[in-house]
Amino acid sequence: MQSQPVAHLRLLFLATCLFLTDHASAQHMNAPDAPCRGPASNAETTACFISASKTADEQLNKIYVRIGEVLSADEQKDLQAAQRLWLRFRDTNCSAERNLYAGGSAAPMVYAACIEANTRQRTTDLKAMYGWRLQKFGKAIE
């Protein structure tokens, strides 16, 4: 059985994710800040988004580690639990979006674009949520 604070944290996190889903998921490839608007073919665009996803993941991991350095042990556990839930949400959400194109050549591209956009958004969210703490302890936000 989960403690009430952890259960409440999970519910709050999932509600937040559902609220942000519409913002983060619609037409990733056509978003003004999408990194792969130039390539013409599906294969080129998919490769671009896979590469961009790796870059977004590296940036997310960097800010996640930096945030962990300024948190107490309990706060680190909360962040870790939230991050695990977010990863499950992101992967499941992007799989559902990909499945809308099942059997089509766009499916891998849609999945890669979704992963990239959601990962980039998570980095932005973590910076917004923990930026004050990073500044307080003299850690650069980037």
Residue ranges and their predicted role:
Residues T16-F19:
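Repetitive helical segments and hydrophobic/amphipathic motifs
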Residues F13-L14, A24:
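Cleavable N-terminal signal peptides
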Residues Q2, A24-E142:
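N-terminal alpha-helical modules
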Residues Q2-F13:
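Bacterial N-terminal signal peptides that target proteins for export
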